[in-house]
């Protein structure tokens, strides 16, 4: 069973606010490469958020992408700059 990809309004809003180079890079990963994955384990640097295995994050360059996983549905929720520690 392949992954069904959806996009939250908050994700699309975040995406529109990015500077041009980051926008291009994230669009390439999210709208092209993610449609070809077989499972979420194929996403780069995937980490669970919390212990319920519903929300995850992964990084693309200097940005964190938040996703919600329900069965075979992956919903992109947010894309935000990585915090500098």
Model feature map: region roles:
Residues 2, 9, 13-16, 24, ...:
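Enriched for short, Lys/Arg-rich terminal
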Residues 22, 47-50, 84:
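Generic low-complexity, intrinsically disordered sequence content enriched
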Residues 32-57:
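A short, surface-exposed loop/turn module that caps and links secondary-structure elements
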């Amino acid at each position: 069973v392949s992954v069904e990809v959806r996009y939250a309004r908050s994700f699309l809003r975040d995406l529109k606010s990015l500077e041009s180079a980051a926008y291009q890079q994230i669009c390439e990963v999210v709208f092209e490469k993610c449609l070809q994955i077989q499972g979420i384990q194929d996403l780069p640097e995937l980490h669970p958020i919390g212990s319920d295995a519903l929300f995850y994050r992964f990084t693309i360059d200097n940005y964190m992408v938040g996703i919600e996983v329900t069965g075979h549905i992956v919903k992109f929720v947010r894309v935000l700059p990585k915090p500098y520690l």
